[in-house]
Amino acid sequence: MLSFSQNRSHSLEQSLKEGYSQMADLNLSLANEAFPIECEACDCNETYLSSNSTNE
């Protein structure tokens, strides 16, 4: 009986992990659809930061 309980618990845990993984993938794909344009401000900020570090 104990092994059945452990097996069921493991199976449930595996199902939850797969479900969370699928939800994360879905969230990423929805975010990519919602914001397809790359952030220009972020790119400018990276350029600014990298140019500052080379000047020092």
Curated annotation (Swiss-Prot):
Name assigned to this protein: Antitoxin MazE
Family affiliation: Belongs to the MazE/EndoAI family.
UniProt keyword annotations, A-Z: Toxin-antitoxin system
Subunit: Forms a complex with cognate toxin MazF which inhibits the endoribonuclease activity of MazF.
Function: Antitoxin component of a type II toxin-antitoxin (TA) system. Labile antitoxin that binds to cognate MazF toxin and counteracts its endoribonuclease activity.
Induction section of the entry: By heat shock and by exposure to sub-MIC concentrations of several antimicrobial agents such as doxycycline, erythromycin and penicillin.
InterPro entries: Arc_rbn_hlx_hlx (IPR013321), MazE (IPR048242)
UniProt-listed GO biological process terms: regulation of DNA-templated transcription
